UniProtKB/Swiss-Prot annotation:
It holds the Pfam family RimP_N. SUPFAM superfamilies: YhbC-like, C-terminal domain, YhbC-like, N-terminal domain. The lineage of its organism: Bacteria, Pseudomonadati, Campylobacterota, Epsilonproteobacteria, Campylobacterales. Keywords: Cytoplasm, Ribosome biogenesis. Disulfide bonds: none annotated. CDD domains: YlxS_C. This is Ribosome maturation factor RimP. GO terms for cellular component: cytosol. One of its GO terms (biological process) is ribosomal small subunit assembly. It is found in: Cytoplasm. Required for maturation of 30S ribosomal subunits.
Amino acid sequence: MSLEKDIESFVKSLDLELYEISVARDGDDSIYRVNVLSTQIEDGKKKGVSLDECVHLSRLISPLLDVTPPMSGEYRLEVGTPGIERKVSTLKQFVLSIGERVALTLKSKEKLKGLLLRVEESNIYLDVDAEEVCVEFAQISKAKTYFEW
């Protein structure tokens, strides 16, 4: 099994979904980031991920990384959420963002903002100004969730 699949199994054991694994640099430090989301609904909204859940997940993942280091050299493990406003770059991330507001930039340079309704195969469906709009995933050059204050 791959390292990502092993991490994903720990994430799922806590009733969370793996959103993204990334490597970042902060000066001389290397950071191995594991971002997770909750798919549970509470009071009609997606439930957040608690700090305790992130700590618990970090403690589950850390021994695995001691045995199978994700990169050479020293690194810091960070477990958290991708935030309210985050990039959306894979079909899985679109699925995990259903019910949230998204801003899309298409390859044609057209920009769309709306509520993400559903994902079917490689089509993304949005509610844009009370009209359902279908966008093919391959036509999206950039996407992110956004929060309306």
